[in-house]
């Protein structure tokens, strides 16, 4: 293989850190690298004013300037990237929740941004626009991701989880095949994304499953 430049897609870096956090509990070097990544978030990660997580890893002044200019002079690019960011909002927050669950701590500034991002996830705007992006229900399933995010950041907001689980099932569940195979081009991967439910607290998972309604075709 070849050593390439830094991957500038933020969720790739974030999920690499979150996955390492799950696997490297006793590894001092791994934990040091994760903490270094978290420390750099203040400079290299940002959100829009409303809390939407920016998709690009904003490393260096030139990269930040180039990304900002593209969003201004290319309206179509801005619209497409905003919808992509909305589709990845819960996928990113899920990884942040994994890091918090693993005991890693964030600066006050970064944690404020995280809370703002969670609030945006609960906003009317997010609930409207997420249906317009191909990166949501058919790709990054909010119905599996939001319950875990809620359990970490806002465990009292159980009704929010009920809503998203139902929306995911309505969009994706095929009662004939008993699988998450509707409205997706990659049914095997989409079915496999059920793994994201394993981080729900056991008691919470049971309560949720008792209250959801499974659609019939």
Residues of each region from the PLM?
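Glycan-recognition and catalytic cores of secretory/periplasmic carbohydrate-active enzymes
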Residues: 1-217
């Amino acid at each position: 293989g070849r050593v390439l430049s830094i991957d500038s897609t933020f969720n790739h870096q974030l999920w690499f850190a979150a996955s390492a956090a799950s696997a490297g509990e006793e590894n001092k070097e791994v934990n040091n690298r994760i903490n270094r990544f978290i420390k750099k978030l203040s400079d290299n990660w940002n959100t829009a004013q409303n809390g939407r997580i920016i998709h690009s890893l904003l490393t260096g002044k030139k990269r930040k300037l180039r990304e900002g200019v593209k969003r201004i002079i290319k309206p179509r690019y801005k619209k497409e990237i905003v919808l992509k960011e909305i589709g990845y909002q819960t996928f990113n927050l899920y990884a942040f929740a994994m890091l918090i669950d693993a005991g890693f701590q964030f600066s006050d500034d970064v944690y404020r941004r995280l809370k703002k991002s969670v609030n945006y996830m609960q906003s009317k705007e997010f609930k409207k626009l997420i249906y317009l992006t191909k990166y949501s229900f058919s790709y990054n399933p909010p119905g599996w991701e939001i319950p875990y995010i809620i359990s970490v950041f806002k465990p009292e907001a159980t009704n929010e989880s009920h809503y998203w689980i139902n929306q995911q099932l309505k969009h994706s569940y095929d009662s004939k095949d008993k699988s998450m195979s509707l409205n997706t081009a990659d049914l095997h991967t989409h079915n496999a994304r059920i793994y994201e439910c394993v981080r729900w607290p056991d008691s919470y998972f049971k309560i949720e499953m008792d209250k959801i309604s499974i659609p019939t075709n």
